[in-house]
């Protein structure tokens, strides 16, 4: 998070305007501008654990991570700077939450890349904080308005669900596979062997569909699920509960909060972080897996066929297998043996 994003660079063109402001930063916080911008006071709220990790090192308790912001998270703020995400329902969840807490009269800035759909902020906030475009640069738009009316926010109304082969999947905005089981996960599930036993870690669990599907035909597995996303963590907990499956679910930046070793690690790792393409999480997953697998344990991941994971798998484990593939996806398996680097 050292370099500033285009959205932050647009904000820096107006840095003098923020020196006397008490600012709440929220949304898709891809850099550490909230910790570095000269303001009267700064807070940050994020639903992304890895963004909170970076910001909390510099901002301490003024950086908060949770699904839903609370009154304490916005205390004494007179300005909101919201970074528009690529997911419109995610923006609606977060903005309705934040605007329901901030006092009338709060200055509202919304910034984002044009390709993210930031211009739809005008329509979304029209009844609460009418926005005007005040700058356009770096293929981004910056919008300003003042909060005239607080919306009513009910997080429960944002929940959704769908069924997959008799399983109930609970979802929230921004959670991967929110609208149905993706093709990659289907391919990975097709490779899982019934009656598997042992400890299984699902990294980047999303809505928890991989874990509950695995548990249905392998009820003796002991599940641990983690994700960087607060909505994903809550969705996975709800999915497990809806299907009467037990498991531990928590927020983690890949393995940052994971303790112990497992017999299998499964994942459909992301290769985007917000609007940006990033292979960091998947490469961290592969390289770090050797520190969290028992001897003979297995890493099994699905990925777009064009992504350069075979080299990292071979470098880390000494070898890998492709156990299923389509034109778009491959399922990779690597076994923890003496050949594997011990991290």
Swiss-Prot record:
What is this protein's function? Answer: Specifically methylates the guanine in position 1207 of 16S rRNA in the 30S particle.
- Show the catalytic activity: guanosine(1207) in 16S rRNA + S-adenosyl-L-methionine = N(2)-methylguanosine(1207) in 16S rRNA + S-adenosyl-L-homocysteine + H(+)
| GO-annotated molecular function | 16S rRNA (guanine(1207)-N(2))-methyltransferase activity; nucleic acid binding
Which family, according to UniProt?
A: Belongs to the methyltransferase superfamily. RsmC family.
- What this protein is called in its record is Ribosomal RNA small subunit methyltransferase C
Keywords of the record: Cytoplasm, Methyltransferase, rRNA processing, S-adenosyl-L-methionine, Transferase
Q: How does it assemble?
A: Monomer.
Alphabetical list of InterPro entries matching this protein: DNA_methylase_N6_adenine_CS, Mtase_sm_N, rRNA_ssu_MeTfrase_C, RsmC/RlmG, SAM-dependent_MTases_sf, Small_mtfrase_dom
Q: Where in the cell is it found?
A: Cytoplasm
Q: What class of enzyme is it?
A: transferase
| GO CC terms | cytoplasm
| HAMAP family the UniProt entry points to | 16SrRNA_methyltr_C
Source domain of life is: Bacteria
Q: What is its main location?
A: cytoplasm
- EC number(s)? 2.1.1.172
């Amino acid at each position: 998070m050292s370099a500033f994003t285009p959205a932050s660079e647009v904000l820096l063109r107006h840095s003098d305007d923020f020196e006397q402001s008490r600012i709440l930063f929220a949304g898709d916080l891809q850099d550490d501008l909230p910790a570095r911008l000269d303001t009267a006071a700064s807070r940050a709220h994020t639903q992304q654990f890895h963004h909170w990790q970076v910001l909390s090192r510099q901002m301490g308790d003024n950086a908060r991570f949770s699904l839903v912001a609370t009154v304490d998270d916005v205390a004494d703020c007179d300005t909101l700077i919201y970074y528009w995400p690529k997911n419109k329902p995610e923006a609606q969840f977060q903005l309705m939450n934040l605007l329901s807490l901030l006092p009338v009269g709060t200055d509202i800035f919304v910034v984002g890349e044009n390709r993210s759909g930031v211009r739809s902020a005008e329509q979304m906030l029209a009844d609460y904080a009418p926005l005007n475009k005040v700058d356009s640069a770096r293929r981004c738009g910056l919008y300003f308005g003042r909060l005239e009316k607080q919306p009513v926010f009910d997080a429960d109304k944002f929940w959704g669900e769908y069924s997959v082969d008799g399983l109930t999947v609970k979802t929230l905005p921004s959670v991967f596979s929110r609208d149905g089981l993706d093709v990659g996960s289907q391919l990975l599930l097709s490779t899982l062997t019934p009656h598997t036993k042992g400890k299984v870690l699902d990294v980047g669990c999303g809505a928890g569909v991989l874990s509950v599907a695995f548990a249905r035909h392998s009820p003796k597995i002991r599940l641990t699920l983690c994700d960087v996303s607060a909505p994903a963590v809550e969705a996975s907990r709800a999915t497990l509960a809806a299907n009467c499956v037990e498991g531990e679910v928590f927020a983690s930046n890949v393995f940052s909060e994971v303790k112990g070793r497992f017999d299998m690690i499964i994942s459909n790792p992301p290769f985007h972080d917000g609007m940006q393409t990033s292979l960091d999480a998947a490469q961290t997953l592969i390289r770090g897996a050797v520190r969290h697998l028992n001897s003979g344990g297995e890493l099994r991941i699905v990925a777009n066929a064009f992504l350069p994971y075979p080299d990292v798998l071979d470098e880390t484990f000494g070898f890998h297998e492709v156990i299923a593939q389509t034109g778009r996806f491959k399922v990779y398996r690597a076994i923890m043996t003496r050949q594997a680097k011990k991290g």
